Amino acid sequence: MANLKDIKRKIGSVKNTQKTTRAMKLVSTAKLRRTEELAKRTKYFEDAINATLRQIASSIKKYKVGGIKGRYFEEPEAVAVVDIIFITADKGLCGGFNYQTIKTVRSLLEEYQSKGAKVRLRAVGKKGIEFFNFQGYELNDSVVGLSSSPNYEEAKNYILKSVGDFLEGKTDKVILIHNGYKNMITQEMKAIQLLPIDISKYTEEVDGSMLEMEPDESEKVLESLLNKYIEFNMYYALIDSLAAEHSARMQAMDAATNNAKEMVRSLTISYNKARQESITTELIEIISGMEAMK
């Protein structure tokens, strides 16, 4: 009977776990839908900035206003220092979401170090911070809370530290790594070179009538736009990462719920078999006792 009690207790425990994972899946699904909408709205503004940058860059090229120069666009002859900014979740229970980001960061870290470059790691998210601290890596900067609750002003202040170091010549590249949202069941790793900006993709020919600027204004407008471009890239990456996190957690909790369901089924079969064996044993004992009394 002790065996039956143990099995029954396990069934109850697994059912409670199943309720928890099912609830977490529903919460993640609801959060994903909200984050999806926010991502769409943010992407709209990012696309608008990219379109304006393309027009301004083409205008500068058309009128040859000082050329497209400056620290923002200069590819270094040799990369001595690289800033790698990476985004992970503040929480777990989201499958391989954090692992994939960490794996990509380590791969890029080793690649640049093998070329003799110094890599400065800047972590956003508790899970990434905990991993690299545990592994003994030095983090140049870290922040908790921003990946789970993206805020434009906080994202702006965070990325401007790297922008400032880059413009002052302290770093040669700024790379942003995060796990991005593709659809409800798929995430994709993204590694974006924020600085220097590859201006070639923004200098395609556009209709000159779309934008007219005075020569002395174009450089100022471009500089202001570049900062917005970098800020929005950081902000959108945070939202994109959060959507991917909710998607990964939703899948992980769905898998856990299904596993719990299968475990309950298996334990129920074991319980019924054990109960049947117990009843059979008791019947045999009763019959044996009656036979002994004859």
Curated annotation (Swiss-Prot):
Gene Ontology MF term list: ATP binding; proton-transporting ATP synthase activity, rotational mechanism
Keyword terms of this UniProt record: ATP synthesis, Cell inner membrane, Cell membrane, CF(1), Hydrogen ion transport, Ion transport, Membrane, Transport
InterPro entries for the chain: ATP_synth_F1_ATPase_gsu, ATP_synth_F1_gsu
Annotated membrane topology: Peripheral membrane protein
Any single biological process term in GO: proton motive force-driven plasma membrane ATP synthesis
Primary subcellular site in the record, as a coarse category: membrane
One cellular-component annotation, GO: plasma membrane
Subcellular location: Cell inner membrane
Family indicated by similarity: Belongs to the ATPase gamma chain family.
Subunit comment: F-type ATPases have 2 components, CF(1) - the catalytic core - and CF(0) - the membrane proton channel. CF(1) has five subunits: alpha(3), beta(3), gamma(1), delta(1), epsilon(1). CF(0) has three main subunits: a, b and c.
Role of this protein: Produces ATP from ADP in the presence of a proton gradient across the membrane. The gamma chain is believed to be important in regulating ATPase activity and the flow of protons through the CF(0) complex.
Protein name: ATP synthase gamma chain
